[in-house]
Amino acid sequence: MKQISDGVFYCGLHDKTRKVFDQLVPLPQGTTYNSYLVKGSQKCALIDTMYVKFADKYMAMLSAENVKIDYIVSNHAEPDHSGLIPTLLEKFPEAKVYCSPKCAENLKNMLGVADEKMHVVADGEELSLGDKTLKFIHTPWVHWPDTMFTQILEDNILFTCDFFGAHYTANELWADCSPELALSAKRYYAEIMMPFAKFCAKYLAKVKEISPKFILPSHGPIYDESGVAFIENLYAEWTSENVAKKVILGYVSMYDNTTLMVNYLENALVSRGIEVVKTDIMETDEGELAMELIDSAGIVFGTSMVLTGPHPKSIYVAYLANILRPKLKFSAIIGSFGWGGNLTAPIDAMFTLTKPKKLENVIAKGRPKPEDFQKLDALADAILAEF
């Protein structure tokens, strides 16, 4: 346990061995699960708890502190933050869980927390711990509908749960504001927060209005005065409507026919002053692709035909590009087939939430021929016209 300020302590844990989050998101550095203890002059509160995998270590840490927990604040019901609430309620049977209405519903359904053990807070409600006052601020959809922030009014410390988080396991508790941290925060935003970018922008404005001294998220390092500006500026950039003069060219090729088309289009776009992020989607992890989607204007899928449709990996990438809801303005499909099937419809069908403009696809039969390369030049011109 580490002291953050007078009466405020960090009781989180590192999980450097975890390689994947939600069985989807790669974790190059593992992650942290941040929990906080607030000691008032009369009462004590935990702000979020711990992933159940670390139950023994977490409970031993609290026992060593010899503290009685009066309140458990659940900013968000996802099990990596709420998992030990039942265990804590057994150890501290008089404690109450303070949470949003939707969080109470989730805690009941997912963890079996009884209604009488929870107090549902109104937006703006306050709770006195004596010389410290907690204020609860409803912030749904960053990134679950149950999310809220908690503020210590006297210290102006803001607990933002997953908002401003990072899967970053540096040894230092305080953010170093390094390029490495910025990259981890960007990966986290892209994979988890980008589908809710409009809500992120809304609550970023709320945070700036509060102007907290410290920001304490539920993953990654915590932010002091300089760190607050660092993470706020990054989120302001990512949540803006701005896109770069950049195109993602994600491809998979079985016998290099599609590769020939991809390389030709890449050169055609670069010669027109367009940045191209070319990536073999059989090798690129989802996090890297998600980060590029934050500010890319368009995406071009390069795919081979597998039986009667596009390569399954292309469909998967299209699915991700849809559910992450990036600011894509346009998309196109290029590729090669042998004798029949439909290379484009299954990819186009993935875009139900994100609605990029569909540019003219270029599909070659077998090895691309001169007329196919001419069509790729026309596609490059069409892409340039979108800027």
PLM regions: where:
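Short, charged N-terminal beta->alpha structural module
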Residues: 250-272
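FMN-binding flavodoxin-like domain, especially the glycine-rich phosphate-binding loop
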Residues: 170-173, 180-215, 219-222, 264-277, ...
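Active-site metal-binding motif and surrounding structural segment of the metallo-beta-lactamase
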Residues: 50-98
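Conserved beta-strand hairpin/beta-sheet module of binuclear metal-dependent hydrolase folds
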Residues: 2-64, 149-152, 156-160, 258
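Metallo-beta-lactamase
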Residues: 3-6, 99-147, 199-204
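Short acidic active-site motifs
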Residues: 84, 284-289
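Active-site-proximal loop/helix segment associated with metal-binding centers of metalloenzymes
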Residues: 143, 147, 163-194, 238-243
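Short N-terminal or domain-adjacent regulatory/targeting segments
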Residues: 216-243
